[in-house]
């Protein structure tokens, strides 16, 4: 369906690493997807296929914070980026940086809502709600 050469896959991995390296904090899957799709850096299917491969290669890592999966670049990913960043065309570097600068508030203002409902005695319930809105 989508033919992608080895050189294209390398470039697309570098673009993902470059994106991580220029974010002010770690991001969720949906935040990263938003950035990649809005900048037209690659097609959705290639991006979805590369993410697990990059986790497996330990270029990026995924961890949980407040029951939310977050992604970040690893030391190995940074080292690869330092050596090969010059392979990313200036057009993509500028487009990603411009998007991050101009949409920083949109990217990081997402709300994380978690709730849990527990039954208590006498048909009463205990509800726990966590609302976390990232801010500058």
What are these regions (language model features)?
Residues 41-56:
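Short amphipathic alpha-helical interaction segments
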Residues 14-18, 34, 52-54:
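Contiguous, well-ordered alpha-helical segments that form the cores/surfaces of helical PPI scaffolds
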Residues 94-136:
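Exposed, interaction-prone assembly regions rather than primary DNA-binding/catalytic cores
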Residues 55-65:
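A short, conserved structural fragment
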Residues 25-36:
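Short acidic, hydrophobic short linear motifs in intrinsically disordered regions
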Residues 1-23:
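Short alpha-helical segments that sit at the start of domains
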Residues 22-26, 67:
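Residues at alpha-helix boundaries and the short loops/turns that link adjacent helices
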Residues 65-87:
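Short, cationic-aromatic polyanion-contact patches
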